[in-house]
């Protein structure tokens, strides 16, 4: 006679085996650019719903205390001559990348403001909630040739939540990150220190510590095709002199890149790096990117402004360039794919969307650890809230 519970365990094992076989029958999504070359889809002008800050200890604050202000060097003065190596590594406090934050900070904002959203909880029930960086990866996927990605998706109270999962390859690459690459990462943050002040009209202070725990994040609402979006992204600074003082139109993205000396170098820059800059800035409606070009010694010798809406002009006639319509059409197709695939409303159920360059987006299904990402404090608080969140958003949303 079998011991009590043995049969039940065997049944559970069989269910688990069946569960693990499910991905083989799930659909996939192709990513070739030629499939998405139609007209540019509808994309609602992003509007800022609110913001939050993360302090030097990475603690959340529902305000703008971490916001910095754009303060470039005088136009008629000498060249910038910023030493991006200054303070490395002595005045550098990098964020602990082993801590997987998932959507937690954004979810805290949603929890605090869910009843103030235009359209109410019903709008949220039809929306996709994620980080801007996750959407950026989707936009660039048709042209990406090196790095794959994984996105975990769960549906809860109608809302689709997307949270990135670090791929094994990305983790191995991060843990083996060479010293030069770590220093280059520091240089990007150091450039921000040279270009930003703590107060409007103030002067930058590059003598302080570079602490990458600190962040100011904008929370935005938009719609791509028929997909309402609520997403958040880190903002480098606000330009007090911007023609439009309404966020996100007054925000500025800061970037660094190596100096270019040949047409071939510029062509490669436009094809690859500028694509990522465009995607990152277009999604939240940031109007321009200010780039500092550094020499081999790590000094910024020149600054150049790239208006977001003009970036595509640099590759418009390049057969190996990128097309904004392809990027946005693929993102819209992925959102439709995810919405139709993730149908069960269960915060502990995860559909893991995986992609490697050259292949389609595939799906596997998982329950609980290690892929479940909606925290219990969020699920419990939202569950205790309004009883019915089934309203479908109207097209105007």
From Swiss-Prot:
Keyword terms: Exonuclease, Hydrolase, Magnesium, Metal-binding, Nuclease, Nucleotide-binding, Nucleus, Phosphoprotein, RNA-binding
Binding positions (substrate): 58, 101, 131-133, 217, 234, 255, 280
Positions annotated to bind Mg(2+) 1: 192, 236, 253-254
Residue numbers bearing the Phosphothreonine modification: 392
Location of the protein in the cell: Nucleus
Enzyme class: hydrolase
Residues bearing the modification Phosphoserine: 394
Pfam annotation, one family: RAI1
Cofactor note: Binds 2 magnesium ions.
Binding site for Mg(2+) 2: 192, 234, 236
Listed EC numbers: 3.6.1.-, 3.1.13.-
InterPro entries cross-referenced by the UniProt entry: RAI1, RAI1-like_fam
GO biological process, one term: nucleic acid metabolic process
The protein's role, per its UniProt record: Decapping enzyme for NAD-capped RNAs: specifically hydrolyzes the nicotinamide adenine dinucleotide (NAD) cap from a subset of RNAs by removing the entire NAD moiety from the 5'-end of an NAD-capped RNA. The NAD-cap is present at the 5'-end of some RNAs and snoRNAs. In contrast to the canonical 5'-end N7 methylguanosine (m7G) cap, the NAD cap promotes mRNA decay. Preferentially acts on NAD-capped transcripts in response to environmental stress.
Assigned protein family: Belongs to the DXO/Dom3Z family.
PANTHER family in the cross-refs: DECAPPING AND EXORIBONUCLEASE PROTEIN, DOM-3 RELATED
This protein's name: Decapping and exoribonuclease protein
């Amino acid at each position: 006679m079998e011991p009590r519970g043995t049969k039940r365990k065997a049944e559970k094992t069989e269910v688990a085996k069946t569960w693990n076989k499910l991905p083989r029958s799930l659909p996939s999504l192709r990513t070739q650019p030629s499939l998405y070359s139609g007209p540019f889809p509808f994309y609602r002008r992003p509007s800022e719903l609110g913001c939050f800050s993360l302090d030097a200890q990475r603690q959340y604050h529902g305000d703008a205390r971490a916001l910095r202000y754009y303060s470039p060097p005088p136009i008629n003065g000498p060249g910038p001559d910023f030493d991006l190596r200054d303070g490395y590594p002595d005045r550098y406090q990098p964020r602990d990348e082993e801590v997987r934050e998932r959507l937690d900070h954004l979810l805290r904002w949603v929890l605090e403001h869910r009843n103030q959203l235009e359209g109410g909880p019903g709008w949220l029930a039809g929306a996709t909630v994620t980080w801007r960086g996750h959407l950026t990866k989707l936009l660039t996927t048709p042209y990406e040739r090196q790095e794959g990605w994984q996105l975990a998706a769960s549906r809860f109270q109608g809302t689709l939540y997307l949270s990135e999962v670090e791929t094994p390859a990305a983790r191995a690459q991060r843990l083996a990150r060479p010293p030069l690459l770590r220093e280059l990462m520091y240089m990007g943050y150091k450039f921000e220190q040279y270009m930003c002040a703590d107060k409007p009209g103030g002067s930058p202070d590059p003598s302080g510590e570079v602490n990458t725990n600190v962040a100011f994040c904008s929370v935005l609402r938009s719609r791509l095709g028929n997909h309402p979006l609520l997403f958040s992204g880190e903002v480098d600074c606000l330009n007090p002199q911007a023609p439009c003082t309404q966020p996100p139109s007054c925000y500025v993205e800061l970037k660094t890149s190596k100096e270019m000396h040949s047409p071939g170098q510029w062509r490669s820059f436009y094809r690859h790096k500028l694509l990522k800059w465009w995607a990152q800035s277009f999604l939240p409606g940031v109007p321009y990117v200010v780039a500092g070009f550094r020499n081999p010694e790590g000094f910024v010798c020149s600054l150049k402004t790239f208006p977001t809406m003009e970036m595509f002009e640099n590759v418009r006639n390049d057969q190996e360039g990128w097309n904004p319509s392809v990027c946005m059409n693929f993102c819209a197709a992925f959102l439709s794919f995810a919405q139709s695939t993730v149908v069960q409303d269960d915060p502990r159920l995860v559909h893991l969307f995986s992609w490697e360059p050259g292949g389609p987006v595939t799906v596997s299904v998982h329950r609980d650890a290690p892929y479940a990402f909606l925290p219990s404090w969020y699920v419990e608080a939202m569950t205790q809230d309004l009883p019915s969140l089934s309203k479908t958003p109207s097209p105007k949303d």
